[in-house]
């Protein structure tokens, strides 16, 4: 594929000449340089180079997209930071600078060249002036290494603004020009004098529309940058290329300025017009310090530019290590080990925070810091995303290290950040094993308090208790484990578990850190059975007045949480109503502070003293709100007042005006004490009074308030399907998973009542569809039969997977979201919906999933991608669709099976053809060392695979052999040339003459053309041992050697003679007799076991000499038909010339006769006109073609014009198919479609077109249209860019020339410019 280029308009570059220093006269512009030979102006190129194929630097890099690619309009100026903007800077010594634009990144464009458009139209030709533009300092870069290197001298001044800018370009005012120059030069005192709020963000309208901050940042003027920022400079300001000041600072490596801009809010992921981020700029230039600073401030290294390149793809070799996390990795690890905070923070980035050491235990920084008790380092690493679950070579996590060495604080930190307390290494040792075996008593207690299980055994069958070195520790481990188990059961208010774990010795067990007892945990529990658990604990002897570390009794805890049901139990068992905590507060203080009116009333009724003053000097009333103060001042039990009653009724009726009159902070959460203890919000939510609900929520209504049955207002709204109310409540913080006394959640209510939209709302906000009510039913269990939409909704991922499997597109469309499109079948093979759609041949579903972002290369449990499924079951259309979405055709599963292995093993012929046409590698082996050919079950698939495999990869019995003859060894008379002395393509299309090779050996005449002497096999070049091996009968060699039977003796033997010498198997005798007959008759290729090759019936390849006119004509045709294609170099690579290594003429008598016969038929059917053309053909099956000719089985029905054999008049088009359709997966060695190393092969063929059918749009055909012999696809606006030629019978083409070549990497723009100057 020819190199892609984006055409540019250069008129601004012509106008914006460099201005002389003040006081100097402007030199006249130099005349345009003369054109190089072969680069004459005009639309018709004089050579391939002149044809627009020279490397052309885009505004961003050396290989631009073609014009009209739709991504954006071509810019008027090359894209580069302001320090090198030639529109605003001039040089004091004009003689040293060419009169062309000083902007960086503009590559020379040959006259008449330019990038081809989307429809291959020629772009506007650049002026000669643009040919001498300065180029980037390195290929692929639009930025010079330094401002001075870009052609801006240290004494440069800003241009006059008007002079030389041409009409229509605004001039820069003198004051602004002076400010910009001061920013550029770093003259901070001058900047302070000139800058003000009005011009701090002024734009350089004569240049790149840059701000003063762009200039100061690009030139690294830190003091100026600081002052500009203080004056209000906009760090987000963009120039006309979309660059912000941070881009400039990063491109030129000013790390301090970069840090300053980032601290002032500059976006580290800002993208310019070509989607380049500051990290792209720094990486391209190898600015390591800047890369580190950017990554530390959140730069995303995965962002890709318009060309699909990430910062890593474009990075200078020196910066690649930073982007892979390998930069100074050893120093980072040492800093973590030694506790060197400064060094660590200088190197630490999100990309290396979890790096592993290259040797030793493969530890991460967190492993080392944890093991060496570097608490501050551990904190920093965790704050910066260190993985607490990372494993070293032995499977140890950082928690293992900390526990093994008894580092309590580090252990606490790791647990706080989610470390798995029961993580196991390769020997199944947990952190508790490590701590217990080393007698780390306090660490053991800490681990147990976080759920460590001392009963887990390692690979030796030993538990942590078994490994404890002392009886005291063993006893402590057992005791604390039981105690923590009881605490956990109490937290969950699990009555059965509490009964099971409860024992007298642990009834008052205290959590080591918080000193909470099981009773504290029970009264704090949110579960409905807390009251029963508390009663059980108290009956078994729990201390009702036990205090935790804050001196809070269970009553304090219950009062603070308004768990009024438990308070009744505590009161009954003698809880002290006026017990004081560490702040001198009673339970009444706690309830008052939390605003729990009912709790305060209850405590007062139990005898709490409202007059007690805390250590801070407050009574309970003084700590409460107005409603609490009123209650405590009255100190009498309340009943529903008339005002409260009227408020409740107004809320129920939706009387907003009355609600507004009666509602106050004191009664907004009043209760219906004679009923269910509902609040006004309960009533308004249940009766769908939206306006009342909204008013109550804005005036302090409690969304968590529970009635007598444990229902919150959200239960009411969901039960009755009031969507707006439910949405309001959720928005104001209502819990979607709250359960009533019967463990019904709002989702239970909505599901049971068939409220689809409510269910959807709740699930969207995190409702748990697996929660069970008291009867053990989930919301799904309560859905009525027939409510399939709700069932699907509640089944979640399972429903989407089922719909994909069954091919129900409507269900898939309804259920699919960006979050679940790649969900997994966790109960099965871990398949995605796309796996199932592909395996069950649900094309519409697969297409929908792919359009909406499904991962085309997602692997299931066995490592299979969707293409494996489609290939295994023979779903051709699905496979073609997956390939269209760039699936990996050579993906391997866990057993190294590729999709081609699957298709070959299952006998899927069409799929094998499709995969091979798109670059599937037939030589890949699975774990058993088998290629697809080894697994093939059908003969046609074997043939396909043999044709696609390179000769060196084929088994001996399948290897085709061609005789290679140097043309210099054959006299011209014996090999008539199809070419005249003139090297024109017209001379290549003459009649096909008989190319029999005389003199050398009459290879084209066949064995029958020569008399065989008695007892001699003519033309034979093998012994009996080779012959037997070729037939797979090596085991008979001993018999033949004993009987001294040679091939000429064998030729006269029949069944009886063979039987007499001991060959009893009829099959063996038959194979021997037929093999000799074919050997004598030269019938190659009919027996797959026959390995010998008779040169007189096979293919001869004549090596043409480079000085041969025929060689030169073919090469010239090949070089001159390189075109620019719309794929931007994606399929055939980026190049502008071939390196032709070898051209061989293909001579095969059988194929030639077949071609001539078909040509005669076509001519008779088309009024004696066979319409022959010389055309190019690229294919993975070239080796098979030169031996067997073109085969329709290689055709792909999904081609633009159906299952035909495609040819092109442009070599660059055929080059796109050398490795498969669309370039396949690239060369076999490097998997690179643009590989400049590997050799490629292409055919230059004689093609009999006969009567052609002109077609402008896609048409799927298996045969030529009636009355026609071929199809010509003509270029059109939205169709082909160049003509394609299609035949549907293989014998209509003959492979005349086999061309071996390489594509050549385009030269750097600077080299091209230098070469052009030298030629001039």
From Swiss-Prot:
Residues 1-88, 111-152 are annotated as: Disordered. It is an enzyme of class 2 (transferase). Its EC number is 2.4.2.30, 2.4.2.-. One of its GO terms (molecular function) is histone binding. SUPFAM superfamilies: ADP-ribosylation (SSF56399), Ankyrin repeat (SSF48403), SAM/Pointed domain (SSF47769). Residues 120-152 have a biased composition (Low complexity). Belongs to the ARTD/PARP family. This is Poly [ADP-ribose] polymerase tankyrase-1. It comes from Mus musculus (Mouse). The lineage of its organism: Eukaryota, Metazoa, Chordata, Craniata, Vertebrata. The gene is Tnks.
């Amino acid at each position: 594929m020819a190199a892609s280029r984006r055409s540019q308009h250069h008129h601004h570059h012509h106008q914006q000449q460099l201005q002389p220093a003040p006081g100097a006269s402007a030199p006249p512009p130099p005349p345009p340089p003369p054109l190089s030979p072969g680069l004459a102006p005009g639309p018709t190129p004089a050579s391939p180079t002149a044809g627009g194929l020279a490397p052309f630097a885009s505004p961003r890099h050396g290989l631009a997209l073609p014009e009209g690619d739709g991504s954006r309009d071509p810019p008027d100026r090359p894209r580069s930071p302001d320090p090198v903007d030639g529109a605003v800077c001039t040089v004091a010594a004009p003689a040293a600078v060419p009169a062309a634009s000083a902007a960086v990144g503009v590559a020379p464009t040959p006259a008449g060249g330019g990038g081809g458009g989307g429809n291959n139209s020629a772009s506007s030709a650049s002026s000669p002036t643009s040919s001498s533009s300065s180029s980037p300092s390195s290929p692929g870069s639009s930025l010079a290494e330094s401002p001075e290197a870009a052609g801006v001298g240290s004494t440069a001044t800003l241009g006059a603004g008007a002079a030389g800018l041409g009409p229509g370009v605004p001039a820069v005012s003198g004051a602004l020009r002076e400010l910009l120059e001061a920013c550029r030069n770093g003259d901070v005192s001058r900047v302070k004098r000139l800058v003000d709020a009005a011009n701090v963000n002024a734009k350089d309208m004569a240049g790149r529309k840059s701000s003063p901050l762009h200039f100061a940042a690009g030139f690294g003027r830190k003091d100026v940058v600081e002052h500009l920022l203080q004056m209000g400079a906009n760090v987000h300001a963009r120039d006309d290329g979309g660059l912000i000041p941070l881009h400039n600072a990063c491109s030129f490596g000013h790390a301090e300025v970069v840090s300053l801009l980032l601290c002032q809010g500059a976006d580290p992921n800002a993208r310019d017009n070509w989607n380049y981020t500051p990290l792209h700029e720094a990486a391209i230039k190898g600015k390591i310090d800047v890369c580190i600073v950017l990554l530390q401030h959140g730069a995303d290294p995965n962002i890709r530019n318009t060309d699909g390149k990430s910062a890593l793809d474009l990075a200078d070799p020196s910066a690649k290590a930073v982007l892979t996390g390998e930069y100074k990795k050893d120093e980072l690890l040492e800093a973590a080990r030694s506790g060197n905070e400064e060094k660590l923070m200088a190197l630490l980035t999100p990309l290396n925070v979890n790096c592993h050491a290259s040797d030793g235990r493969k530890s991460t920084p967190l492993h080392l810091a944890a093991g060496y008790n570097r608490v501050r380092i551990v904190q920093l690493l965790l704050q910066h995303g260190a993985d607490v679950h990372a494993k070293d070579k032995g499977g140890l996590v950082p928690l293992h290290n900390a526990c093994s060495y008894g580092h309590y604080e580090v252990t606490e930190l790791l647990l706080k950040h989610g470390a798995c307390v029961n993580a196991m290494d390769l020997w199944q040792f947990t952190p508790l094993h490590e701590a217990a075996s080393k007698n780390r008593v306090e660490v053991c207690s800490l681990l147990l308090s976080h759920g460590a299980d001392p009963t887990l055994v390692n690979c030796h069958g030993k538990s942590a208790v078994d490994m404890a070195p002392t009886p005291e520790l063993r006893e402590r481990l057992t005791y604390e484990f039981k105690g923590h188990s009881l605490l956990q059961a109490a937290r969950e208010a699990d009555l059965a578990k509490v009964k099971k774990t409860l024992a007298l010795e642990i009834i008052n067990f205290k959590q080591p850190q918080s000193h909470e007892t099981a009773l504290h945990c029970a009264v704090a529990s949110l579960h409905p059975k807390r009251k029963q658990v508390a009663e059980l604990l108290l009956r078994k002897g729990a201390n009702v007045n036990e205090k935790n570390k804050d001196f809070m009794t269970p009553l304090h805890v219950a009062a603070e949480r308004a768990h009024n049901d438990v308070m009744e139990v505590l009161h009954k068992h003698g809880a002290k109503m006026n017990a004081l905590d560490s702040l001198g507060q009673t339970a009444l203080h706690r309830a008052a502070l939390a605003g729990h009116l009912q709790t305060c009333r209850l405590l007062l009724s139990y005898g709490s003293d409202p007059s007690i003053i805390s250590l801070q000097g407050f009574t309970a009333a003084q700590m409460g709100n107005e409603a609490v103060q009123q209650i405590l001042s009255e100190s009498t039990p309340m009943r529903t007042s008339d005002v409260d009653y009227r408020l409740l009724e107004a809320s129920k009726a939706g009387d907003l005006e009355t609600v507004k009159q009666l509602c106050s902070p004191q009664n907004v959460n009043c209760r219906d004490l004679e009923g269910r203890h509902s609040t006004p919000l309960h009533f308004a939510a249940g009766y769908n009074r939206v306006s009342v609900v909204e008013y109550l929520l804005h005036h302090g209504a409690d969304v968590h308030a529970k009635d007598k049955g444990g229902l919150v207002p959200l239960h009411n709204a969901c039960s009755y399907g009031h969507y707006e109310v439910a949405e309001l409540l959720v928005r104001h913080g209502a819990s979607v998973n709250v359960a009533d006394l019967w463990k019904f959640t709002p989702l239970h209510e909505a599901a049971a009542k068939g409220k689809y939209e409510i269910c959807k709302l709740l699930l969207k906000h995190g409702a748990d569809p697996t929660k069970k009510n008291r009867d053990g039913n989930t919301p799904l269990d309560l859905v009525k039969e027939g409510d399939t939409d709700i069932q699907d909704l509640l089944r979640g991922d399972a429903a989407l997977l089922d719909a994909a499997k069954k091919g129900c597109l409507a269900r898939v469309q309804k259920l699919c979201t960006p979050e679940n499109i790649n969900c997994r079948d966790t109960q099965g093979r871990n398949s995605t919906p796309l796996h199932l759609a592909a395996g069950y041949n649900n094309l519409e579903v697969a297409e929908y999933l792919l359009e909406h972002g499904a991962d085309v290369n997602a692997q299931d449990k066995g490592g299979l991608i969707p293409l494996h499924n489609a290939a295994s079951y023979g779903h051709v259309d699905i496979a073609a669709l997956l390939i269209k979405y760039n699936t990996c055709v050579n993906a391997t599963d866990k057993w190294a099976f590729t999709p081609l292995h699957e298709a070959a093993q299952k006998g899927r012929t069409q799929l094998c053809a499709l995969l091979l046409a798109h670059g599937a590698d037939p030589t890949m082996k699975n774990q058993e060392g088998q290629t697809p050919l080894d697994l093939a079950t059908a003969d046609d698939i074997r043939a396909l695979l043999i044709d696609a495999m390179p000769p060196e990869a084929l088994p001996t019995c399948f290897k085709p052999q061609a005789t290679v003859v140097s043309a210099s060894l054959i006299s011209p008379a014996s090999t008539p040339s199809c070419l005249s002395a003139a090297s024109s393509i017209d001379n290549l299309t003459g009649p096909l003459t008989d190319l029999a090779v005389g003199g050398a050996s009459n290879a084209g005449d066949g064995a029958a053309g020569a008399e065989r002497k008695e007892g001699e096999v003519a033309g034979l070049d093998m012994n009996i041992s080779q012959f037997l091996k070729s037939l797979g009968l090596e085991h008979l060699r001993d018999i033949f050697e004993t009987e001294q039977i040679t091939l000429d003796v064998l030729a006269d033997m029949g069944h009886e003679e063979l039987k007499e010498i001991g060959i009893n198997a009829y099959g063996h005798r038959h194979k021997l007799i037929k093999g000799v007959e074919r050997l004598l008759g030269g019938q190659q290729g009919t027996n797959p076991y026959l390995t010998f090759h008779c040169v007189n019936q096979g293919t001869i390849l004549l090596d043409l000499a480079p000085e041969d006119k025929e060689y030169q004509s073919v090469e010239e045709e090949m070089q001159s038909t390189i075109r620019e294609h719309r794929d931007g170099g994606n399929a055939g690579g980026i190049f502008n010339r071939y390196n032709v290594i070898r051209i061989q003429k293909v001579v095969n008598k059988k194929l030639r006769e077949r071609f001539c016969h078909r040509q005669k038929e076509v001519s008779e059917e088309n009024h004696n006109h066979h319409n022959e053309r010389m055309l190019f053909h690229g294919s993975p099956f070239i080796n098979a073609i030169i031996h067997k000719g073109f085969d329709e089985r290689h055709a792909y029905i999904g081609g633009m014009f159906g299952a035909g054999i495609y040819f092109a008049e442009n070599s660059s088009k055929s080059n796109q198919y050398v490795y498969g359709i669309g370039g396949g997966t690239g060369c076999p060695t490097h998997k690179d479609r643009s590989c400049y190393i590997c050799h490629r092969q292409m055919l230059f063929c004689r093609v009999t077109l006969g009567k052609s059918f002109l077609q402008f749009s896609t048409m799927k055909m298996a045969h030529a249209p009636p009355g026609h012999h071929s199809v010509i696809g003509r270029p059109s606006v939205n169709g082909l860019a160049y003509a394609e030629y299609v035949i549907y019978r293989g014998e209509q083409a003959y492979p005349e020339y086999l061309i071996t070549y390489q594509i050549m990497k385009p030269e750097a723009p600077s080299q091209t410019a230098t070469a052009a100057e030298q030629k001039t």
